[in-house]
């Protein structure tokens, strides 16, 4: 009885601080790609979005699926959960900012850079990526910070066989259960840097980079 009273008092204290939490809302089903216009911000306010598999794709490894979100140059996507099916996740056309976006079950890819630019990813997470999380299809830079990834093939992959330059950085993150590598390229000019990151069950940090094109510091294997 005393234990039960303590639990009730604790629950009451939490409720008084945070208020009564409503039941989780049903995911928003996206029938056609949500376009975030140039220079604007889309704040999902923590809501979950899933693709309509009939119109966007079923989140398998099938090519040419459509994205749930399309970001035009300079756009920002934040506070979004992308559930399953995720189709082809997020497409960035030029510079884009991704803040606190979680991919619960990565589809074809979590995010693809479709035209040259810089992708800044801060916070968030990605899980269950059969192949790659972030696909880079154009010259540019991808900066990833404070990110969590688990059960993935690769974290960052430059489009296979391409020779353009991609600069990849990963900082203060936690990466685990990787099948291939954290960063992979086939380009002799691309660069990769991993700092202050914890990782576990990762075969290799870098794959395909030319000599002298990778660096690391402050990382911890666990």
Curated annotation (Swiss-Prot):
InterPro entries attached to this UniProt entry: Pectate_lyase_PlyH/PlyE-like (IPR004898), Pectin_lyas_fold (IPR012334), Pectin_lyase_fold/virulence (IPR011050)
Cofactor: Ca(2+)
Locations listed in the record: Secreted
Class in the EC hierarchy, top level: lyase
Cross-referenced PANTHER family: PECTATE LYASE F-RELATED
Endpoints of the signal sequence: 1-26
Name of the coding gene: pelA
Family named by the database record: Belongs to the polysaccharide lyase 3 family.
Any one GO MF annotation of this record: calcium ion binding
UniProt KW keywords: Calcium, Carbohydrate metabolism, Lyase, Polysaccharide degradation, Secreted, Signal
Pfam families documented for this protein: Pectate_lyase
Temperature dependence: Optimum temperature is 45 degrees Celsius.
Protein name: Pectate lyase A
Lineage, broadest ranks: Bacteria, Bacillati, Bacillota, Bacilli, Bacillales
DNA damage listed as a keyword: no
Pathway field: Glycan metabolism; pectin degradation
This enzyme's EC code(s): 4.2.2.2, 4.2.2.10
pH dependence remark: Optimum pH is 10.5.
Record's catalysed reaction(s): Eliminative cleavage of (1->4)-alpha-D-galacturonan to give oligosaccharides with 4-deoxy-alpha-D-galact-4-enuronosyl groups at their non-reducing ends; Eliminative cleavage of (1->4)-alpha-D-galacturonan methyl ester to give oligosaccharides with 4-deoxy-6-O-methyl-alpha-D-galact-4-enuronosyl groups at their non-reducing ends
GO biological process: pectin catabolic process
Any one annotated GO CC term: extracellular region
Primary role: Catalyzes the depolymerization of both polygalacturonate and pectins with low (20-34%) and high (90%) levels of methyl esterification, with an endo mode of action. In contrast to the majority of pectate lyases, displays high activity on highly methylated pectins. Does not show xylanase and cellulase activity.
């Amino acid at each position: 009885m005393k234990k039960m009273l303590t639990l009730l008092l604790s629950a009451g204290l939490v409720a008084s601080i945070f208020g009564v939490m409503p039941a989780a809302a049903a995911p928003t089903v996206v029938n056609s790609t949500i376009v975030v216009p140039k220079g604007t911000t889309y704040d999902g306010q923590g809501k979950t979005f899933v693709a309509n598999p009939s119109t966007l794709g079923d989140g398998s490894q099938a090519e040419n699926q459509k994205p749930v979100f399309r970001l035009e140059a300079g756009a920002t996507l934040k506070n979004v959960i992308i559930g399953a099916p995720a189709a082809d996740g997020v497409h960035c056309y030029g510079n884009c900012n991704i803040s606190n976006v979680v991919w619960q079950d990565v589809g074809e890819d979590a995010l693809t850079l479709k035209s040259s630019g810089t992708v800044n990813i801060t916070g968030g997470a990605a899980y269950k990526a059969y192949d790659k999380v972030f696909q880079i299809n154009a010259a540019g830079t991808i900066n990833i910070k404070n990110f969590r990834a688990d059960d993935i093939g690769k974290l960052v992959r430059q489009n296979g066989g391409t020779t353009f330059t991609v600069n990849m950085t990963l900082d203060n993150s936690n990466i685990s259960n990787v099948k291939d590598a954290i960063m992979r390229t086939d380009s002799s000019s691309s660069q990769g840097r991993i700092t202050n990151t914890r990782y576990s069950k990762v075969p290799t940090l870098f794959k395909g980079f030319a000599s002298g094109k990778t660096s690391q510091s402050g990382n911890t294997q666990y």
